[in-house]
Amino acid sequence: MKQTTKFNKRLTGIVMMVVLGVSLISCVGNETEPLTFAYLADTHIGTAIGANDLRNSVRDINKMDNIDFMILAGDATEYDLAGELDTVKAILAELKVPYHIIPGNHELKWSASGGEKFKKLFGDDKFNVAYKGYRFIGVNQGPLMRMGEGFIAREDINWVHSALKKMWPKKQPVFFVTHYPIDHTVTNSYEFLDIIKHYNVQAIMHGHGHRNLLSNYSDVPGIMGRSNLSRGGPGGYNIVTIKNDTMTWVERHPVEKVNLEPWLVLPLKDFEYTDSHKALKPDMSVNKQYPEVKVDWSYDSEYSITAAVTVVNNRVIFGNRSGKVIALSLDRGKELWSYQTGGPIFTEPAVMDSFVYVTSTDSSLYCINLKNGKKVWKYKTKAAIVAHPAIYDNKVYFGGSDGKFRAVNAKTGKLVWDFMKISTYVETKPLIAKGKVIFGAWDTYLYALDAENGNMQWMWKGEKSGLLYSPAVVHPVYANGKVFIVAPDRVMSAINIEDGKTVWRSNTFKVRENIGLSEDASTVYAKTMWDIVCAISTEGDKPETRWSTEANYGFEIDPSIPVERDGNVYFATQFGFVYSLDATDGSITWQHRIGSNLLNTPVVIDNMIVVSGMDGKVTKLVTAN
């Protein structure tokens, strides 16, 4: 029977009954033996109360004899640093029942390991298990290492598709576990729904919103579970029971040992879904307004790309999450060579002469021959590297996740010096100017070191405390005696390069993590978090706005950088747009949409724009001369 679901919600007391209006199917689960599991989300270890609240829930679960397993639906920690994931692992090791866990945005965006430590500790960042006739598939939505909306990585989309195709029986009832809701906050949610709606999906269970809530994701029931935290009230989780083809959700307070009345009772049914998620698909109509912009070629690497490409000698060089460094021909987009490192790559390659320099989460800096892709040398550190390398005066400068910043001889791969006073990890690409190497870290500080010997010159800190306000992602730029940065405190700062003193700070525009420099160094450009691109003078001791343009791109937190070339400013967004503005007044000259997902900083050569995306694709646009 074909079923188009409609929700008719009736609240009786605090019990929500959801009637979906089709007959039960005989293959749904076990009619006599109930399945019961504990459902936790958003434990946020690293906060003052997170670890204790999780311990309380684990102790409580261990005292019950009817719990078959436990699920933790992401944001287990505040960050992937300072041993927070180890704490989660140690607490969950006390469970007497199996558990299944996925990462959330906190473990993947703020990650010293690029998400690799989570996989190492818990075996994977996804799961596919079956209990008593029901299948549970868990997959994360990032965003992986870059600030943006949620996104299901291309490699994970493929994994989900493969898991479902292998499933037997084909009509087995399936529950998906995600961290984000599968709605507009996940930029490629339509791709996910296109796949799963061919199967008997009973519900998508998730966290992120820190409350209990029933939703509807293109006709698929969506169930948000509360945060485990006791912030603002009792800590708690949900006990979920499936019995007689009905799923019941009950909130449990472990310290008080109290079960509330069921807040959701969901009949399980034989679902056959219609295509009702067209509104989530990207609107590409803007491309018809600017027919002078065309796609010349697109290359699909099949794994997430989180950094800009480098274009040199008619080659397009980039790394991706598979750990490969890939070289394409600029003219046709054909693969010329690839080199496999030992871990995912989240950084932009640097090039000097005939050599490519790439950092990898396998803890190494690689030097690769530009012509043939052969390794020249490898420099190994003691932790993952998620920071971009920069080259100056025959040295490769890069930060690490081991509390160090290094300079390595670009020809020999030998250490020149290291700086060992960083308390967390480095993610940015350093600026080298006026004999200094300048970079931020996830410890709230901007550092200036002597480029020759690594000695500290100065440290700078913004006005807000807390790691999340660190100037750690922005690539600093230099002009007219000042270093310019932006940070998650939404303030642009100009800092004297000689002594690290603040020249000015401005919150006129709500900036975040991107800033670019004009070709003549007279202006810095930044995308704001809402619609506006601003151009600020680099001259003088006070901020002066040259122009601001309402580009109408909506909410924007993609850290990709505005780039000026030949009188135009180019930038990309988290929703797959590339813009070109007139550098003199900020007027829009054209825009083009490549897809729905986050794009990295565009590289512009003449009338060619090469841009990589989180979807694993590299696209070359060309414009009419």
Model-predicted segments: where are they?
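N-terminal active-site segment of His-dependent metallophosphoesterases
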Residues: C27-T87
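Acidic/histidine-rich helix-loop elements
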Residues: F37-N56, T77-Y79, L108-L121, P143-R154
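Metal-dependent catalytic neighborhoods of phosphoester/phosphodiester hydrolases
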Residues: G50-D53, G74-L92, L108-K120, T185-E191, ...
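His/acidic metal-ligating clusters that form di-metal
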Residues: N62-F69, G148-P221
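Binuclear metal-dependent phosphoesterase catalytic core
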Residues: V220-D283
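Extracytoplasmic beta-rich repeat domains
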Residues: Y290-T310, L336-M352, W377-Y392, S401, ...
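Short loop/turn segments that connect beta-strands within beta-propeller blades
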Residues: S329-G333, N369-G373, N409-G413, D450-N453, ...
